[in-house]
A protein has these predicted regions:
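Conserved beta-strand signature within the Rossmann-like core of class I S-adenosyl-L-methionine
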Residues: 136-143
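SAM-dependent methyltransferase
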Residues: 143-208
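A short glycine-rich, Lys/Arg-flanked "PGG" loop and its adjoining helix->strand segment in the class I
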Residues: 123-135
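Conserved class I S-adenosyl-L-methionine
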Residues: 1-46
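C-terminal lobe and adjacent flexible extensions of AdoMet/dcAdoMet transferase-like proteins
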Residues: 206-238
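Class I SAM-dependent methyltransferase SAM/SAH-binding core
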Residues: 49-98
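A short acidic, Gly/Pro-enriched loop at the edge of an enzyme's catalytic core
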Residues: 100-108
């Protein structure tokens, strides 16, 4: 999605993700961060839901990379009320392929971001992240092997009551080509059952298989590490 598309989704973002992958990540990520003493880079920090977790579970500097202004605005507002986060977190207004910090980090965390990168750009992504990591540094991202979805009708994915308004997220798979899934999303606001606001976003997600991912990461100089179901852990070769 581009920045304008993100701005349409932001009011729904925390509501939807708190009802999705975020609670699971709060359980599964901390054990993998337990031994991290140095800096951490978060790719695609979004509104800061996982940034908060990283701050709680680590003690070093945190670089929160978020290119979308709408997401970054919420992220900074979230950090504003936490003195410890304000001291340690640097928010970088760039994308993953453009990030360049002057100190190597001990870990890179990338939650619900991998699907934004088509096969042709992942090679560059792994190269950039390897450059940012210290030798032996840890790369963590969420991933599961899933069957390819099939195109279908528009479906309600979540509805969340906030005061008098219901915030609804609708989704529809439009087409699948290889690892690329093209989808349509509707973000609706209802009051007493009447739609009072609606925005539509069409986007592409890329879902590489496990063998393909392993080959890419191995070629980029990473070695697979242990991780719980739903997460992948790779280390930069020492």
């Amino acid at each position: 999605m581009n920045d304008d598309q993100y701005s349409r989704a932001v009011p729904f973002y925390d509501l939807w993700h708190e009802d999705g992958h975020v609670p699971e990540i709060r359980e599964s990520l901390p054990p993998l961060l337990k031994g991290v003493r140095g800096g951490v880079m978060e790719i695609g920090a979004g509104t800061g839901l996982i940034t908060e977790l990283i701050v709680r579970e680590t003690r070093g500097e945190v670089f929160a990379v978020e290119p979308a202004l709408a997401m970054r605005s919420v992220l900074l507002s979230r950090l504003a009320g936490d003195a410890e986060a304000r001291r340690r977190v640097t928010v970088l207004a760039c994308g993953a392929l453009d990030v360049d910090v002057d100190v190597p980090v001990e870990a890179v965390v990338m939650i619900s971001v991998l699907q934004a990168f088509p096969a042709g750009r992942r090679e560059e992504l792994w190269r950039v992240l390897a450059r940012q990591l210290e030798p032996g540094g840890l790369l963590l991202f969420n991933w599961r092997e899933r069957p390819a979805p099939t195109p279908g009708e528009l479906e309600l994915m979540g509805s969340y009551q906030v005061g008098r308004h219901a915030y609804e997220v609708w989704g529809q798979v439009l087409g699948v080509s290889g690892e690329t899934v093209r989808s349509r999303f509707l973000y609706r606001v209802r009051q007493r059952g009447v739609v009072i606001g609606e925005d539509e976003v069409t986007s592409e997600a890329h879902r590489p298989g496990g063998e393909r991912l392993a080959a890419e990461l191995t070629a980029a100089g990473f070695v697979k590490d242990e991780a719980p179901d739903g997460l992948a852990a790779w280390r930069k070769a020492a």
